[in-house]
From Swiss-Prot:
PANTHER family, sorted: GLUTAMATE RACEMASE (PTHR21198:SF2)
InterPro entries named in the record: Asp/Glu/hydantoin_racemase, Asp/Glu_race, Asp/Glu_racemase_AS_1, Asp/Glu_racemase_AS_2, Glu_race
Protein role: Provides the (R)-glutamate required for cell wall biosynthesis.
Gene: murI
The enzyme's E.C. designation: 5.1.1.3
Official protein name in the record: Glutamate racemase
Protein origin, superkingdom: Bacteria
Alphabetical list of Gene3D superfamilies matching this protein: 3.40.50.1860
Catalysed conversion reaction: L-glutamate = D-glutamate
UniProt similarity note: Belongs to the aspartate/glutamate racemases family.
KW Cell wall biogenesis/degradation (keyword) present: yes
Residues that coordinate or bind substrate: 28-29, 60-61, 92-93, 201-202
């Protein structure tokens, strides 16, 4: 089904009698999930992590549910071969379109970012704006999650198709990115929102741009913070928290390792060593061809 440039299997050297030492798997379509990884470093410093970026098939936000399910199953099958103890879908589109389905198909816990983000948003405001990929917006996942908690909250959603490509192309400082952000935020500002949710894990990377365009009283919710808090609670409940020193984070991508490494250094503070995983026959996205 796939091949890797590294040896498959239990690279972390833990025994089956020590499940606490197994790594947490984290995946996203690209570098956006690094915002979740940074939170793991802060909140769960003893945990080892395997990070996967499906860069050959990004952006996910314009894909159908059937495509997303195929991609997610590919990744989870690979994660299972790496003997992870838990997986975090550091991708709102996957969380919206695939989480409930694949949770029933694997024997390790799988956490998504939407419910933790929705809970945090409801605690902060009553007029909530959500910026996300078009697929997440179309799914209404955030609105439904928020209304299940508090049906009296007003929710507005805006799909932002240009954000992920701009971030993956490292164009955050580009004036064009600011103008795109202004256009996406304007309808939410007109609705006098009091809270904004980053409905895509890429979007915290745009924080300086977005904050400069929002009224100062608008609170910003980063679901990455809250999904890792949920991970902490889940690990404690399952008795899977690691008390040993962590091993170095392992990075893998389906696209170009060098491109991911160059982008990742901006958010990690170090240059990650990245391996390539080839899911046989996957169609490489036009964006990935442009980045190559």
């Amino acid at each position: 089904m796939y091949s890797s440039s590294s040896i498959e299997g239990n690279l972390y050297g833990f025994s089956e009698q020590e499940p606490q030492r197994a790594p947490i798997g984290v995946f996203d379509s690209g570098v956006g999930g690094l915002t979740v990884l940074r939170q793991i470093y802060r909140q769960l410093p003893n945990e080892s992590v395997i990070y996967f970026g499906d860069t050959a098939r990004l952006p996910y936000g314009i894909r159908s549910q059937a495509e997303i399910l195929t991609f997610v199953r590919d990744i989870l099958d690979w994660m299972q071969q790496q003997h992870v103890k838990m997986v975090v879908m550091a991708c709102n589109t996957s969380s919206a379109l695939a989480l409930d389905i694949v949770r029933e198909e694997y024997d390790f816990p799988i956490l998504g970012v939407i419910l933790p983000g929705a809970k945090a948003a409801v605690q902060q405001g009553k007029r909530i704006g959500v910026i996300s990929t078009p697929a997440t917006a179309k799914s209404n996942a955030y609105r439904q999650a928020i209304w299940e908690i508090d049906p009296n909250v007003e929710v507005w959603q805006v799909g932002c198709p240009e954000f992920v490509p701009l971030i993956e192309q490292n164009r955050i400082q580009d004036p064009y990115t600011t103008e795109v952000a202004r256009a996406y935020l304007e309808p939410l500002i007109q609705q006098d929102i009091d809270t904004l949710v980053y409905g895509c894990t890429h979007y915290p990377l745009l924080a300086p741009v977005l904050r400069s365009l929002l009224p100062p009283q608008v609170k910003i919710i980063d679901p990455a913070v809250h999904v890792v808090t949920a991970c902490t609670q889940e690990l404690d409940i399952l008795g899977l928290s690691n008390t040993h020193p962590p091993l170095p984070t392992r990075f893998a991508v389906s696209g170009c390792p060098q491109q991911f490494s160059q982008s990742g250094v901006n958010w990690l503070g170090y240059t990650p060593l990245v391996e390539a995983v080839d899911f046989t026959g996957i169609p490489v996205s036009q964006l990935q061809q442009d980045l190559a």
